[in-house]
Amino acid sequence: MMTYWPSPAKLNLFLYITGQRADGYHTLQTLFQFLDYGDTLHIEPRRDGEIHLLTPVNGVENEDNLIVRAARGLMKAALESGRLPAGSGADISIEKRLPMGGGLGGGSSNAATVLVALNHLWQCGLSVDELAKLGLTLGADVPVFVRGHAAFAEGVGEILTPVNPPEKWYLVAHPGVIIPTPVIFKDPQLPRNTPKRSIDTLLKCEFSNDCEVIARKRFREVDAALSWLLEYAPSRLTGTGACVFAEFDTEPCARQVLEQAPEWLNAFVAKGVNLSPLHRSLL
């Protein structure tokens, strides 16, 4: 039985760096919202206990891929708690639409979809809290995808408060470069002391991203993409980049601008949604 599972993108509608811990991790305040756009995972349960990724990613060993690591992590957690049915395994393939290094959470979303889907298909019965805790061992952004609701995040991104920001339309553009997260977070000029504010205060302020100035300075493609988008609508960086986005009140307005996109810009239009398409598929 082949099953299909959404693995949606996310946007950071704002991102503020509030400090840096002794272990080097940055503390932040950010607002996550999902998009009705993303990858699709195809998962076929096996009965021999094997995990096979049928669509390898160039340059990434299968055992290092977050998809495989998530599947093996769930298998281990369920086995240790006596909740793994004998022979549980899976063939997994992916239809990839989200760019690597784009700030859309593609890898984290893939991992979360595997955790949620296999917990369902294998009938392990792990709670959302257990899955989120497991997800955090794979990456700071995985828990928000596991929980499946737009959220205000603090700490290193793991302290989540569900929120319901307006569900606007977005033109999301990838400028053709990959930005490794450490490149931004290790930059000495990155703002690291933005004052912490309450969620109510932040939702009333104009949204921005502390990483944007560094991304624009170090990657001229990001600067060019944002300069173009800002001619049409409020626009900013998502995550540490490289993707940028402009917000619109209606789909036709977003698509009208998309039609004028320069050839060097890879862009798409999607709606912001507060309930993840993954979790909507489970309803």
From Swiss-Prot:
Domain of life: Bacteria
Pfam hit, one: GHMP_kinases_N
Recorded GO MF terms: 4-(cytidine 5'-diphospho)-2-C-methyl-D-erythritol kinase activity; ATP binding
Sections of the chain in a coiled coil: none
Keyword Kinase: yes
Keywords assigned by UniProt, alphabetized: ATP-binding, Isoprene biosynthesis, Kinase, Nucleotide-binding, Transferase
Keyword Secreted included in the entry's annotation: no
Family matches, as InterPro entries: GHMP_kinase_C_dom, GHMP_kinase_C_sf, GHMP_kinase_N_dom, IspE, Ribosomal_Su5_D2-typ_SF, Ribsml_uS5_D2-typ_fold_subgr
EC number: 2.7.1.148
GO-annotated biological processes: isopentenyl diphosphate biosynthetic process, methylerythritol 4-phosphate pathway; terpenoid biosynthetic process
Residues given in the record as ATP binding sites: P99, M100, G101, G102, G103, L104, G105, G106, G107, S108, S109
Catalytic activity: 4-CDP-2-C-methyl-D-erythritol + ATP = 4-CDP-2-C-methyl-D-erythritol 2-phosphate + ADP + H(+)
Active site residues according to the UniProt entry: K10, D141
Metabolic or biological pathway: Isoprenoid biosynthesis; isopentenyl diphosphate biosynthesis via DXP pathway; isopentenyl diphosphate from 1-deoxy-D-xylulose 5-phosphate: step 3/6
Family: Belongs to the GHMP kinase family. IspE subfamily.
Function: Catalyzes the phosphorylation of the position 2 hydroxy group of 4-diphosphocytidyl-2C-methyl-D-erythritol.
Subunit structure: Homodimer.
Name this protein carries in UniProt: 4-diphosphocytidyl-2-C-methyl-D-erythritol kinase
Organism of provenance: Salmonella arizonae (strain ATCC BAA-731 / CDC346-86 / RSK2980)
